[in-house]
Amino acid sequence: MNNKIKPSILPGFMELLPKEQLVFNDIVSKITGVYEQNGFLPMDTPIIEKEEVLLAKSAGETEKQVYRIDNEDRKQVLRFDLTVPFSRFAAQYMSDLTFPFKRYQLGKVYRGERNQKGRYREFYQCDVDVVGNGNLSIKNDAFIINMASKALRKIGLDSYKFQISNRKILTGVLEGLNITNMQEVMILIDKYDKITEEQFLSELNKLIGEEKAKVISKVIKISGSSDEVVENLKKVEIKNEMLEKGIEEVEEVIKYLKLFGVEDSEYAINLKIIRGLDYYTGTVFETLLTGNESYGSICSGGRYDNLAQNYTENVLPGVGMSIGITRLFFVLREIGFIENYNSSLNEKYLIVPIGDTFEYCTKILNKLLVNGKSAEIYFEEGKLKKKLTYANKLDIKYVILIGEDEVTNKELVIKDMITGEQKKLNIEEI
């Protein structure tokens, strides 16, 4: 009887083999490098938070997806994003921070997502946020989208589009139509791309009636260039302060994006973008890969002016965005991007001793390491073919062969595993 347990992991969790993990780490390093270059400071928060802290502003779908820890003494939950813990952090350490406070954070988050392809229950997010004390310029909204642009370009992506909106626009329209069940309507609009047009209109008619549904449907379908969308929004017959403020803010964000150098082809105004999380108050955006829109957003964010009010009397408005690194990696792997990922990950050296040359090999190793190269010695015995196969399987580009002649002449033989080219070098030439 075989009583061995089959090694496996739970659905909704990602594990990578070392070759892919190296690429994953390289992507993270490039993204966080962009953040640091632009003045964002690193920080971290606990994976486990008090339930009353984490769920102070959450309801609906968000609360249903939270993982709770079974503990009789206190209610604890796993964080479902990095933004809410950041708001708690900003309120808790307010006297120690310099505002506007710009931070980035990489960490795992947990959501009880329905098990499906590309959706994970544990996943890495890589966030940037700016929080102000009392007020925060709208320029930051555009700057955050600019950070997303720089990060995606840094890892080699150039075919994507930021879908930008402002929650005040739809809130203003709904208020102008005297709609009371606003939250239900917002949730339905957020699902627009996941259901058919007929289903959407049918559900909307049930919620607010046919006449009002026609108005909402017409507004969210306004499209074209950013200038055209703004002009058409200004022609909407509903007039109120909330709607006008939303139009003004989205117009400003577009203006500053242009000044930051974000290309027109990188963004569009999409009034169907709501963002499911309950804390957004103004600018919201999602990011779709051009030609691969079915995979959903790879980078999302927005403005949250009231999130910290659950923890402090002080006004700490914020804006931020999150790149779902785990989801992004899955999508890039699916579309073949990872296969051809451009990095220096294979610029490695494997030193192979032939005969009694180990001492000399360690000198070569130390010289390479001092010069910032990635290198290792093959310690095990065996045929040369086996050692070269080892290098090939690990995508090691260069193999250095050290025999007794090389030790005598203070030389080495270096073999390029891609081209097959082999040449002798003096030790000083390394």
Swiss-Prot record:
Family: Belongs to the class-II aminoacyl-tRNA synthetase family.
NCBIfam families: hisS
Subcellular location(s) per record: Cytoplasm
Principal place of residence: cytoplasm
Presence of the UniProt keyword Lipid metabolism in the record: no
EC code: 6.1.1.21
Lineage, uppermost ranks: Bacteria, Bacillati, Bacillota, Clostridia, Eubacteriales
Pfam families, per database record: HGTP_anticodon, tRNA-synt_His
Name by which UniProt lists this protein: Histidine--tRNA ligase
Cellular component aspect of the GO annotation: cytoplasm
GO molecular function: ATP binding; catalytic activity, acting on a protein; histidine-tRNA ligase activity; transferase activity
Keywords: Aminoacyl-tRNA synthetase, ATP-binding, Cytoplasm, Ligase, Nucleotide-binding, Protein biosynthesis
Assembly behavior: Homodimer.
